[in-house]
């Protein structure tokens, strides 16, 4: 299928909310070897984030049920829940491995500018983070190191090449801070990164174009929400789940 046709079908699949189809079309487009435009890389991101988002949510529900049935000593439900959770986990790993393969084989090395490179390295950090959520033991440690390395490389480039209000730079800092808090168990680092990012963007807000204003201020609000949540947590109050960058 022609590249232009694949992109068109991915857009149709998005409108129909058939995200697995959308992801398959975008995967084929990436494998054609041409660099993606800004719109195309967003299509790729939205497709896979929706696919993996459903799997992550399902895995959390099943893990919670499994934990509860183990605590209750329920031999009736236990094996079935474990088996189904493992099935979802295998699917989730498969999607993450596919995305990481596309990033390493095509997208990162083909990125022609700093913004694209940061976008793809952030994506690499995100998909290693999703793998870390379901990993255990030595495997988890290796995956966490890979996520941290990708996020850090993206941060280094973004600080040199992009303004503090750039939505991609802000989204990267948001997700890296969530990684610090939820995966690496480093709440102080998470709070420090979120606060510094928010403060630097706030100081630079007057330079924002109308096009970027909505995207940037939305992510700044999420950074502030997380800071409120994490500060309450560290004060011993009941928190909740930290928001990360929105799907689209």
Swiss-Prot record:
One of its GO terms (cellular component) is cytosol. The keyword Secreted applies. Expressed in dorsal skin (at protein level). Expressed in the basal layer of skin epithelium and in outer root sheath of hair follicle. Pfam families: 14-3-3. The record marks 56, 129 as: Interaction with phosphoserine on interacting protein. The modification Phosphoserine is found at residues 5, 74, 248. It is found in: Cytoplasm; Nucleus; Secreted. SUPFAM superfamilies: 14-3-3 protein (SSF48445). InterPro entries: 14-3-3, 14-3-3_CS, 14-3-3_dom_sf, 14-3-3_domain, 14-3-3_sigma. Its main location: cytoplasm. The keyword Repeat does not apply. Ubiquitinated. Ubiquitination by RFFL induces proteasomal degradation and indirectly regulates p53/TP53 activation. PROSITE patterns: 1433_1, 1433_2. Induction: Induced in damaged or stressed epidermis. Keywords: Cytoplasm, Nucleus, Phosphoprotein, Secreted, Ubl conjugation. Homodimer. Interacts with KRT17 and SAMSN1. Found in a complex with XPO7, EIF4A1, ARHGAP1, VPS26A, VPS29 and VPS35. Interacts with GAB2. Interacts with SRPK2. Interacts with COPS6. Interacts with COP1; this interaction leads to proteasomal degradation. Interacts with the 'Thr-369' phosphorylated form of DAPK2. Interacts with PI4KB. Interacts with SLITRK1. Interacts with LRRK2; this interaction is dependent on LRRK2 phosphorylation. Belongs to the 14-3-3 family. Adapter protein implicated in the regulation of a large spectrum of both general and specialized signaling pathways. Binds to a large number of partners, usually by recognition of a phosphoserine or phosphothreonine motif. Binding generally results in the modulation of the activity of the binding partner. Promotes cytosolic retention of GBP1 GTPase by binding to phosphorylated GBP1, thereby inhibiting the innate immune response. Also acts as a TP53/p53-regulated inhibitor of G2/M progression. This is 14-3-3 protein sigma. It comes from Mus musculus (Mouse). The gene is Sfn.
């Amino acid at each position: 299928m022609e590249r232009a046709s694949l992109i068109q079908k991915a857009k149709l699949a998005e409108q129909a909310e058939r995200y697995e189809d959308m992801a398959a079309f975008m995967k084929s487009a990436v494998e054609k070897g041409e660099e993606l435009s800004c719109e195309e890389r967003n299509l790729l991101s939205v497709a896979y984030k929706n696919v993996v988002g459903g799997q992550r949510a399902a895995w959390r529900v099943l893990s919670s049920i499994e934990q509860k049935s183990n605590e209750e000593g329920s031999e009736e439900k236990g094996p079935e829940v474990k088996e189904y959770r493992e099935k979802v986990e295998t699917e989730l790993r498969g999607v993450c491995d596919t995305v990481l393969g596309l990033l390493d084989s095509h997208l990162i090395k083909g990125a022609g500018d700093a913004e694209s490179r940061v976008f793809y390295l952030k994506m690499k950090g995100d998909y290693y983070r999703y793998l870390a959520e379901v990993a255990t033991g030595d495997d988890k440690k290796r995956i966490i190191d890979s996520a941290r390395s990708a996020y850090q490389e993206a941060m280094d480039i973004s600080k040199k090449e992009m303004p503090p209000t750039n939505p991609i730079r802000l989204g990267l800092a948001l997700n890296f801070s969530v990684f610090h808090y939820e995966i690496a168990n480093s709440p102080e680092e998470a709070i420090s990164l979120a606060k510094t990012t928010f403060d630097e963007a706030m100081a630079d807000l007057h330079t924002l174009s109308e096009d970027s204003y909505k995207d940037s201020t939305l992510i700044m609000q999420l950074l502030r929400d997380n800071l409120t949540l994490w500060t309450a947590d560290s004060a011993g109050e009941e928190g909740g789940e930290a928001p990360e960058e929105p799907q689209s």
